[in-house]
């Protein structure tokens, strides 16, 4: 059947339009149309190409869905080897690298690019007259594998380059970069894999590599891989003189280029930026294992050349490892204050992130079983920032046959009572309210600094007092007297007096601290402050309805239900009655007089370590000027006040377009104009 000129023109128009929308959505993060509009146009193009296959072009957006499975990947010879990089681990190593370069090219002025080193899979993409032709893995640097069909499925790999100001596209250009899987996408993928009973991936890099090397490209298409371009290989028909110019050109062609790349003329600034990345890495939405420093000028790069397989003009500044392998020696169970049984790994000591790690989290029994983690396994352990180290999974290939399957507990290891799984939760609970382990954890929480702040009572004292029989419930803390400690070793007159004074002082803690101390599920310090401001007393809060609770900004349905359930439990009603009878005041904090209304109507969330000020003090400052501080980032959040190691809240704020402030910028908002 002959194809009309109108149909040919419509197919071409749809291709151009959809490629433009892809570029704005995936590369610029600035969608031009809704998902429904995009899908409608894509379906129209699919229908045309199904009826007229001759109109299906290599750069068509319909080609991103994957093609027929392959039996194996063909080999590809890289025309110019994909080199490895030498490593630097500190400022001295960076300075030594620079001196070696100066010995060859002299002490002439140099500029440097500094780029995040994405922890993914290096690939090379060849474009002929602007059209994506061949894509290959790095392989051994000289020979890789042809994974063109899989690379076509990645949304921010352009299938056709965008011309620059009417200039002709290069006749041939090889673009090099990194395929990676964002952390959130990695976690979602592993959840799906575990739910389906399939192998979970140890880390985002392995997931990206495994996804790219699928013989069936429809599997690759189902996984949200991303791509950052960072270099070119051989090229013709375009003039490129520096790394910075190359990145700008690639960005204009339609590639995603890491926005955190910087150009410096001062080498000290290079070192400072490398150090800055040591703290920033935790706030990223993707994994990095260092930064790459390159001498910017291509003429200098050619003069410096290569030694072995490493270019003299570039070096990788490597961060301390966040993942290591070690042996799982045992699995022990801790019991939390809610009765949750928490499995913990006992490990052969391993250095991780600058510290020696011997224990790590295993989350819950379902996590261990779904990943088939066995005692004696070689396991991958990860530590990120201040997060407790945790076991990612076993290295199955390293098994010897001596490993032991872990038996999930059926009874509490402390009190011996049968355990239960509540509702749809994956966690296992000890439901014995008199379990000593639960009581000890509850005491620790009650006396903690963010709650009742009883100086002289901590983890060790809580365990001792329970073992001595002095404390059998939280109210027993307020029944302690001098006679309770009579003759007990380590508790002299002065120490006992100080402890009893601290306990007496805690009776005057404000209502929000008492609510925090009660340990209601989902109620942290911010929610506790909101509840205290609204209800003004424990009896009033105890009578609150779901409707009243959810009317408070920041209190969601699940938290409201937790509050109602807590106060409807007879044991908790008795707890509160006893505490009030023992003299607990639980009165609301005095509302500080407003210093100004400059932040009135503005909502803030605070995250990270702030310079020179605690989060509590920052919250008080914001509230003193009429602002409100919440606990989680949402579309309603006006500002995120972020310090160092800001973490996932910063990532979410950036994705929602929430303005991020430093302390200096917050102070600027408060200055008189």
From Swiss-Prot:
One biological process term from GO is: DNA replication
Q: Does the keyword Cell membrane apply?
A: no
Q: Which InterPro entries match?
A: BRCT_dom, BRCT_dom_sf, DisA/LigA_HHH, DNA_ligase, DNA_ligase_AS, DNAligase_adenylation, DNAligase_N, Hlx-hairpin-Hlx_DNA-bd_motif
What Pfam families is this protein classified in? BRCT (PF00533), DNA_ligase_aden (PF01653), DNA_ligase_OB (PF03120), DNA_ligase_ZBD (PF03119), HHH_2 (PF12826)
Q: Which Gene3D superfamilies match?
A: 5' to 3' exonuclease, C-terminal subdomain, 6.20.10.30, BRCT domain, DNA ligase/mRNA capping enzyme, Helix hairpin bin, Nucleic acid-binding proteins
Q: Name one GO cellular component term.
A: cytosol
EC id? 6.5.1.2
Which protein are we looking at? DNA ligase
Q: What is the lineage of its organism?
A: Bacteria, Bacillati, Chloroflexota, Chloroflexia, Herpetosiphonales
């Amino acid at each position: 059947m002959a194809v009309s000129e109108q149909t040919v023109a419509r197919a071409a128009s749809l291709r151009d339009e959809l490629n433009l929308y892809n570029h704005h959505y995936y590369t610029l993060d600035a969608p031009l149309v809704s998902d429904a509009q995009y899908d409608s146009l894509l379906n129209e193009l699919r229908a045309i190409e199904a009826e007229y296959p001759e109109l299906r072009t290599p750069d068509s957006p319909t080609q991103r869905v994957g093609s027929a499975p392959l039996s194996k990947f063909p080999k590809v010879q890289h025309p110019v080897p994909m080199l490895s990089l030498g490593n630097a681990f500190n400022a001295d190593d960076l300075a030594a690298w620079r001196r070696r370069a100066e010995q060859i090219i002299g002490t002439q002025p140099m500029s440097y690019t500094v780029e995040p080193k994405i922890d993914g899979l290096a690939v090379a993409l060849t474009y002929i007259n602007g059209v994506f032709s061949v894509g290959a893995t790095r392989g051994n640097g000289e020979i890789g594998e042809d994974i063109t069909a899989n690379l076509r499925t990645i949304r921010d790999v352009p299938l056709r380059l965008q011309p620059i100001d009417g200039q002709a596209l290069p006749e041939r250009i090889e673009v090099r970069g990194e395929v990676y899987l964002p952390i959130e996408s990695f976690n979602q993928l592993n959840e799906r894999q575990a739910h389906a009973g399939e192998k979970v991936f140890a880390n985002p890099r392995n997931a990206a590599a495994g996804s790219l090397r699928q013989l069936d490209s429809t599997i690759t298409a189902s996984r949200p891989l991303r791509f950052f371009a960072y270099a070119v290989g051989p090229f013709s028909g375009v003039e490129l003189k520096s790394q910075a110019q190359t990145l700008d050109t690639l960005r204009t062609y339609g590639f995603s280029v890491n926005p955190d790349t910087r150009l410096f003329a001062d080498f000290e600034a290079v070192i400072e930026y490398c150090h800055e990345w040591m703290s920033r890495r935790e706030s990223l939405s993707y994994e990095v294992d260092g930064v790459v420093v390159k001498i910017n000028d291509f003429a200098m790069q050619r003069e410096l050349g290569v030694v072995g397989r490493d270019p003299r003009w570039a070096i990788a500044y490597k961060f301390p490892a966040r993942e290591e392998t070690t042996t799982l020696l045992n699995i022990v169970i801790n019991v939390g204050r809610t009765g949750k049984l928490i499995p913990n790994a006992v490990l052969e000591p391993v250095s991780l992130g600058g510290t020696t790690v011997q224990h790590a989290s295993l989350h819950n029994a379902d996590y261990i079983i779904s990943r088939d983690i066995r005692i004696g396994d070689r396991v991958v352990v990860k530590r990120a920032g201040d997060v407790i180290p945790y076991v990612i999974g076993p290295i199955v290939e390293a098994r010897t046959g001596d490993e032991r399957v872990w038996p999930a507990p059926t009874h509490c290891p402390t009190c011996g009572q049968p355990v239960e799984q509540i509702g749809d939760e994956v966690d296992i609970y000890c439901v014995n309210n008199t379990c000593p382990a639960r009581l000890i954890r509850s005491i620790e929480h009650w006396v903690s600094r963010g709650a009742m702040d009883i100086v002289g009572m901590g983890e060790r004292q809580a365990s001792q007092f329970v073992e001595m029989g002095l404390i059998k419930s939280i109210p027993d803390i307020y029944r302690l007297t001098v006679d309770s400690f009579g003759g007990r070793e380590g508790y002299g007159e002065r120490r006992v007096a100080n402890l009893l004074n601290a306990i007496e002082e805690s009776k005057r803690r404000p209502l929000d601290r008492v609510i925090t101390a009660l340990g209601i599920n989902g109620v942290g310090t911010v929610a506790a402050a909101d509840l205290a401001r609204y209800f003004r007393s424990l009896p009033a809060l105890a009578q609150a309805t779901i409707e009243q609770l959810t009317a408070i900004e920041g209190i969601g349905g699940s938290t409201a239900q937790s509050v109602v359930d807590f106060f409807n439990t007879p044991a908790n009603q008795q707890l509160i009655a006893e505490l009030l009878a023992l003299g607990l005041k639980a009165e609301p904090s005095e509302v500080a007089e407003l210093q100004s209304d400059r932040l009135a109507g503005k909502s803030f969330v605070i995250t990270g370590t702030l310079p020179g000020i605690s989060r509590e003090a920052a919250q008080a400052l914001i509230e003193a000027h009429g602002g409100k501080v919440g606990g989680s980032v949402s579309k309603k959040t006006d500002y995120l006040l972020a310090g160092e190691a800001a973490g996932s809240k910063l990532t979410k704020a950036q994705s929602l377009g929430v303005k991020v402030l430093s302390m200096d910028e917050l102070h600027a908002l408060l200055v008189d104009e």
